[in-house]
């Protein structure tokens, strides 16, 4: 009797296929049109998106993508494929028939394409793992919507598990804590992707997860309260976002005598534009120009053995 297969979707939001304005526009269009991401009334938002953002923003951010692009594609795509291969290799050594696929909510390889593949393989179950340790309606819920949409016209839907969050998981906390290694007189900044503050007021508990994540990692790394703090990066548009802002914090830290800095981004399961360019290049310049003496970015977990073990643990519990 053949072994039943389990299909695993490792899901990120997405990335351009090329560092060109048309490719960036192709990615941004569905991303920014999703009401989970930008929830303004469509009759107000669509004219802004199509008349002001999509015609101009791709050209503005194109050089940023070009700074960090790799021979394998965007950093996010390359890291996602690396995670897929490492996790597949892990399960190939086990007794379970697991198919692992990296997939994206707003780009290729799409969730719908992977779901179609799994249905053709007649998997006994699907496990959806959004690679966002902290829940947010802008990420985790958006991925759930995309997964549900991929099943909308299917008749043969197998059972599935959807992993809501894993920020408090000891193996996640320990994996990140082991990467820190603070040096003498070095301060640690936990930088998480921000969301509009209004979303928090309306019930999104993302920032609560972020604060708890930072606290747990700091304790695991043996840090005192004075050695670390939290900020939020990557704000977009005129609305108030979750504070304090990372770019403003980096300018203030040297004035407070914190001139040696390490930055870690626990919300990013893979290095991407927001970590490699925004944090490691642009914000490094801001910090050093403000009087900083040393700046160190601590890479995401990517396809490290500790990260693959964590992901395997999350999946194995649901087989």
UniProtKB/Swiss-Prot annotation:
Q: Where in the cell is it found?
A: Cytoplasm
Q: Which GO terms describe its cellular component?
A: cytoplasm
Q: Which residues of this UniProt protein bind Fe(2+)?
A: 193, 274
SUPFAM superfamilies reported for this sequence: Chelatase
Superkingdom of the source species: Bacteria
What keywords does the record list, in alphabetical order? Cytoplasm, Heme biosynthesis, Iron, Lyase, Metal-binding, Porphyrin biosynthesis
GO terms assigned for molecular function: ferrochelatase activity; metal ion binding
> rRNA-binding among the record's keywords?
no
Specify where it is mainly localized.
cytoplasm
Q: Kindly state a single biological-process term from the GO annotations of this entry.
A: heme biosynthetic process
| Pathway membership, UniProt | Porphyrin-containing compound metabolism; protoheme biosynthesis
Q: Does the keyword Iron apply?
A: yes
Q: What InterPro entries does its record include?
A: Ferrochelatase, Ferrochelatase_AS, Ferrochelatase_C, Ferrochelatase_N
Q: Which Pfam families match?
A: Ferrochelatase
What is the E.C. number?
A: 4.99.1.9
Supply the enzyme class, top level.
Answer: lyase
Per its record, the protein catalyses:
Fe-coproporphyrin III + 2 H(+) = coproporphyrin III + Fe(2+)
Q: What's this protein's function?
A: Involved in coproporphyrin-dependent heme b biosynthesis. Catalyzes the insertion of ferrous iron into coproporphyrin III to form Fe-coproporphyrin III.
Q: Read off the NCBIfam families from this record.
A: hemH
What family is it from?
Belongs to the ferrochelatase family.
Name of this chain's protein: Coproporphyrin III ferrochelatase
